[in-house]
């Protein structure tokens, strides 16, 4: 089990080092104009008012670009997003990523009942079942890793995070490099997923 945890951590490090050359450039002002149709779901500044839809504000440009490209190519599927991304050019994708990454993420909050288990899963994982610590890839403050395209989770809607973790677990979502997320969550229980989703939503570090 310990070897599995080290394997995931090593995979994160190796992928980060091999992805360091990935650069996302774009025009935030042009992205703001392109983003107008996105506002109905993702909010005026990328802070979605609905927990069903993700906050895009403050998310890493590298991650945003990859997700839009994956929706466009079919590597990630969602009825709404696949349709929205289909007509985006590479320039549109870069501009949208630049715009949303330049916005400020609205902080979340963690209900008290999820703190203990959520913190344990995030910082330590579950040694008995072989679930690795989320912190190994997403960082101590859930800020993610832009060089490796690991997303920022801090401030994200707990409901959205929970949905994505369960989608990885079931295999419905499969656009994670080297199956890292599918491997990490496959032995997580519903209770663990719910707790860690709420925990990271409220986790933040002083800038």
Write out the residue ranges for each language-model feature.
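Gram-negative bacterial Sec-dependent N-terminal signal peptides
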Residues: 2-21
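Electrostatic cytochrome c docking/interface patches
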Residues: 18-35, 49-52, 102-128, 207
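Predominantly soluble domains enriched in secretory-pathway, periplasmic, or organellar proteins
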Residues: 21, 102, 117-124, 135, ...
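The feature marks the first
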Residues: 26-73
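Sequence context surrounding c-type heme c attachment/ligation sites in exported
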Residues: 29-36, 61, 123-135, 154-163
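The canonical Cys-X-X-Cys-His
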Residues: 31, 38-45, 96, 131-140, ...
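Axial heme c-ligation environment in periplasmic c-type cytochrome domains
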Residues: 49-55, 70-113, 146-152, 169-195, ...
């Amino acid at each position: 089990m310990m070897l599995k945890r080290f394997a995931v951590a090593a995979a994160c490090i190796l992928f980060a080092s091999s992805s360091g050359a990935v650069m996302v450039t774009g025009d935030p002002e042009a992205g703001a104009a392109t983003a107008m149709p996105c506002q109905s779901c993702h909010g005026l500044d990328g802070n979605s008012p609905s927990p069903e839809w993700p906050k895009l504000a403050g998310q890493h440009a590298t991650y945003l670009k990859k997700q839009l490209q994956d929706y466009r190519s079919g590597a990630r599927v969602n009825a709404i997003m696949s349709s929205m991304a289909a007509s985006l050019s590479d320039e549109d994708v870069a501009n949208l990523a630049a715009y949303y990454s330049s916005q400020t993420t609205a902080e979340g909050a963690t209900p008290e009942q999820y703190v203990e288990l959520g913190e344990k899963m995030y910082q330590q994982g579950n040694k008995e079942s072989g679930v690795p610590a989320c912190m190994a890839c997403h960082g101590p403050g859930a800020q993610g890793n832009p060089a490796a395209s690991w997303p920022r989770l801090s401030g994200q809607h707990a409901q959205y995070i929970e949905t994505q973790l369960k989608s990885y677990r079931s295999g419905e979502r499969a656009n994670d490099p080297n199956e890292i997320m599918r491997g990490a969550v496959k032995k997580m229980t519903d209770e663990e997923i719910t707790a860690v989703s709420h925990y990271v939503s409220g986790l933040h570090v002083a800038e």
